């Protein structure tokens, strides 16, 4: 080991103690006497500022000096300075040996003085240490204060000639104060006066460096003092949320967590002993009074017996928008309205008329302020106040207790099959009595017959006009399909059934025995043979909007947009004749229905529904008041005592005709028009379809007990058709809890449970 490396190691140890040396001993250091070079020349050679004081411990180094000046050199044994490269050292040069100079001062106070090179090297170390002190962020590395008086108020030295004492114990005298004129001229002559700060503690002017002024500017802007500080540094997650393989602490659970506490047991024993000896006494429960007022309210009687009840006065009404100094235009009355106020009685006249002002300061004093205050005082003084008890009712108790949907199964809730083939919107569908076949009509002029289970199209009839309505004959032995389009009504032979049924059907549809109609009927309808498909065609004087079969399959009703007795006519297929209704219809008819078991006939107009008896035309009719804007469809329960009416405002009414002529329930479920409603023949189900492309399925149970009201429970919302046009028709399967829907997207869908 060379002398240089040995001295470097010792200087590294001395570096850690350099700060403590100045704080403990505070011994006065003697300047190192240079033989050939001055201190300023050494500082210039080392590349540091000349104003550095140069006080340092000879022989002590910091980490930067150790790395730069005393690192291992190359094979040639030479080393160059890292900063300027001006000072070079070689192995042949004299090196300061630290064997005897680790302690900077001897007992007699003399110092070890090295050679010229050592002095130059020591001054270089001092200058670099000064740079390290300036760059340090620690408050311990700051230049110590001259004044050693401590943290005391300077008011104590106001009357003295000095402000404290320096390190040697000498008084620090105050500077002579300049006149204001001299100080002003000095500030004008000095261009750096804005960077100077007066330190009253040391009685001197301190000039801020550029770095310090930048720090002040950052603090004024609310930024971090140091430019290198990153306030948005990436967050280091010490503990991640992911499950680790090893636990943070795998110490075993202590035994005290598995055994009962000994000290708690002692406390319990102490409390039990005190209870047994009677040291701890419990409060006896207060006995409730058994006396009460027979005809009075207990709560108010208790309050009146104790003290006079105070009822706070009612609060004043808060001002509204009309009392604003700049209200909206709709609150300001016109001249005509103001004139009408003058004609009113004083009691009916509004107490305040809104007025507009340009600003808040232009508002005058309120004229009726004193009058209203006086009237309120009279009301509070003369009018008695009564406390009214509010009835607290749980809102949940007001809701009807409906059964769970799981208990009401089966009902259609999912799409099972789609029937595709039409090119236009499907306007109407109908199922036969057996449930094996379904017929559909579309705006493309085609009528299709489908097999329900497979979705296979069995037959197609093509017409020139859009199909409005199709209806299958309810008798299974008469497979006839009624089709309405424009002004014509066709009876088509579906060619289903046995040979005997086909013979009966062909006889019914034979047009050779058509009788001559009456004169009153001839102006309305005309029976004609269907040359295209071999059936019968009935031509009406107006377009047909709805048709409905009688339960026996012989009569068929058609609805046209006409008033009085011409809007609804009845056709008899067996005799091939038409008859008008024996009563007048008030309003334009929308749709008609036959009663499922009696001889009643339902006619729905735009506002209400009227019930007629076909066997007794002179009997008074029954009128059902719907309260709807316009009726769109109607369906009757198989029992015949309940009627469902749909409207074009999205509402659906349930009528219990034995109960009242007004709706028992009104359901607002669709946001758009309801196109049709349907009731199942055997299951307690009914449904509605709308232009919003949805179909609602409900549970509607009708009880035989007349004292029990029908139960209506919403079950399912069926979606699946496109939003354009919505769902135009819906029908239930006659035997299964299935629902068919016809959409404007030319698709028929089957929903099953």
Swiss-Prot record:
Subcellular location, record wording: Nucleus, Nucleolus; Nucleus, Nucleoplasm
GO terms for biological process, alphabetical: gamete generation; maturation of 5.8S rRNA from tricistronic rRNA transcript (SSU-rRNA, 5.8S rRNA, LSU-rRNA); maturation of LSU-rRNA from tricistronic rRNA transcript (SSU-rRNA, 5.8S rRNA, LSU-rRNA); regulation of cell division
GO molecular function: ribonucleoprotein complex binding
Name of this chain's protein: Ribosome biogenesis protein BOP1 homolog
Record's keyword annotation contains Metal-binding: no
Broad class of where this protein is predominantly found: nucleus
Disruption phenotype: Embryonic lethality when homozygous.
Function as written in the Swiss-Prot or TrEMBL entry: Required for maturation of ribosomal RNAs and formation of the large ribosomal subunit. Plays an essential role in cell growth and survival through its regulation of ribosome biogenesis and mitotic progression.
UniProt feature, compositional bias: Basic and acidic residues: 7-18, 30-41, 110-121
Tagged with keyword rRNA processing: yes
Organism: Arabidopsis thaliana (Mouse-ear cress)
Gene from which this protein is expressed: BOP1
Disordered as annotated region, ranges: 1-155
Subunit structure, interactors included: Interacts with PES. Interacts with WDR12.
């Amino acid at each position: 080991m060379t002398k240089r490396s040995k001295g470097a190691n010792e200087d590294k140890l001395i570096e850690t103690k350099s700060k403590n040396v100045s704080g403990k001993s505070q011994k006065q250091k003697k300047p190192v006497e240079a033989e050939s070079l001055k201190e300023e020349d050494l500082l210039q050679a080392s590349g540091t500022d000349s104003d550095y004081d140069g006080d340092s411990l000879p022989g002590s180094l910091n980490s930067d000096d150790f790395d730069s000046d005393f690192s291992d050199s190359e094979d040639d044994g030479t080393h160059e300075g890292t900063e300027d490269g001006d000072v070079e050292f070689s192995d042949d040069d004299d090196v300061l040996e630290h064997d005897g100079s680790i302690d900077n001062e001897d007992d007699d106070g003399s110092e070890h003085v090295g050679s010229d090179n050592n002095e130059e090297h020591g001054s270089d170390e001092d200058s670099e240490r000064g740079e390290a002190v300036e760059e340090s962020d620690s408050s311990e590395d700051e230049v110590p204060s001259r004044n050693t008086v401590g943290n005391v108020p300077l008011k104590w030295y106001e009357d003295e000639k000095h402000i404290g004492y320096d390190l040697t114990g000498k008084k620090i005298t105050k500077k002579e104060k300049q006149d204001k004129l001299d100080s002003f001229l000095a500030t004008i002559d000095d261009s750096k006066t804005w960077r100077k700060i007066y330190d009253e503690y040391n009685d001197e002017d301190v000039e801020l460096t550029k770095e310090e002024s930048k720090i002040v500017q950052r603090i004024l802007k609310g930024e971090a003092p140091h430019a290198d500080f990153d306030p948005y540094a990436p967050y280091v997650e010490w503990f991640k949320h992911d499950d680790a393989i090893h636990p943070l602490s795998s110490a075993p659970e202590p035994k005290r967590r598995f055994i009962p506490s000994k000290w708690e047991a002692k406390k319990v024993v102490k409390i039990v002993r005190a209870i047994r000896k009677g040291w701890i006494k419990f409060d006896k429960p207060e006995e409730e009074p058994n006396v009460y007022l027979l005809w009075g309210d207990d709560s108010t009687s208790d309050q009146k017996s104790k003290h006079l009840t105070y009822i706070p006065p009612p609060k004043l009404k808060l001002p509204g928008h009309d009392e604003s100094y700049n209200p909206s235009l709709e609150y300001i009355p016109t001249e005509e309205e103001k004139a009408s106020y003058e004609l009113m009685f004083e009691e009916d006249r509004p107490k305040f008329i809104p007025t507009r002002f340009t600003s808040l300061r232009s508002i005058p004093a309120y004229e009726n302020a004193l009058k209203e205050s006086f009237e309120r005082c009279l009301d509070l003084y003369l009018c008695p106040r009564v406390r009214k008890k509010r009835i607290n009712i749980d809102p949940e108790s007001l809701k009807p207790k409906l059964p769970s949907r799981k208990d009401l199964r089966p009902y259609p809730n999912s799409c099972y099959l789609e029937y595709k083939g039409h090119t236009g919107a499907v306007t109407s569908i109908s199922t036969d009595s057996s449930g094996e076949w379904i017929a559909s009509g579309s705006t493309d002029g085609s009528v299709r017959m489908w097999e329900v289970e497979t979705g296979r199209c069995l037959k197609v009839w093509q017409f020139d006009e859009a199909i409005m309505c199709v209806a299958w004959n309810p008798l299974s032995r008469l497979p006839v399909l009624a089709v309405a389009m424009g002004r014509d009504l066709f009876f088509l032979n579906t060619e289903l059934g046995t040979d005997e049924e086909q013979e009966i059907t062909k006889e019914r549809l034979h047009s050779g025995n058509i009788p001559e109609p009456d004169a009153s009927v001839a102006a309305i309808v005309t029976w004609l043979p269907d040359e295209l498909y071999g059936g019968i065609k009935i031509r009406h004087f107006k377009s047909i909007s709805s048709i409905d079969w009688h339960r026996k399959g012989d009569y068929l009703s058609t609805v046209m947009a006409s008033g009085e007795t011409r809007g609804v006519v009845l056709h008899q297929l067996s005799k091939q004749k038409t008859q008008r209704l024996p009563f007048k219809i008030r309003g334009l008819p929308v749709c008609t229905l036959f009663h499922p078991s009696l001889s009643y006939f339902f006619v729905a107009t735009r506002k209400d529904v009227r019930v007629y008896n076909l066997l007794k035309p002179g009997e008074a009719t029954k009128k059902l008041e719907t309260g709807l804007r316009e009726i769109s469809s109607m369906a009757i329960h198989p029992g015949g005592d309940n009627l469902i009416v749909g409207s074009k405002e999205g509402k659906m009414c349930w009528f219990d005709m034995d109960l009242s002529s007004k709706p028992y329930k009104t359901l607002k479920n669709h946001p758009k028009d309801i196109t049709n409603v349907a009731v199942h023949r055997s299951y307690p189900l009914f449904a509605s379809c709308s232009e919003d492309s949805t179909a609602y399925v409900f549970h509607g149970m009708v009880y035989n007990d007349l004292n029990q009201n029908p139960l209506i429970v919403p079950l399912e919302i069926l979606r699946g058709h496109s939003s354009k046009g919505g769902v135009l028709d819906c029908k239930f399967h006659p035997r299964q809890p299935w629902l068919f829907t016809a959409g404007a997207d030319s698709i028929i869908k089957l929903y099953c449970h």
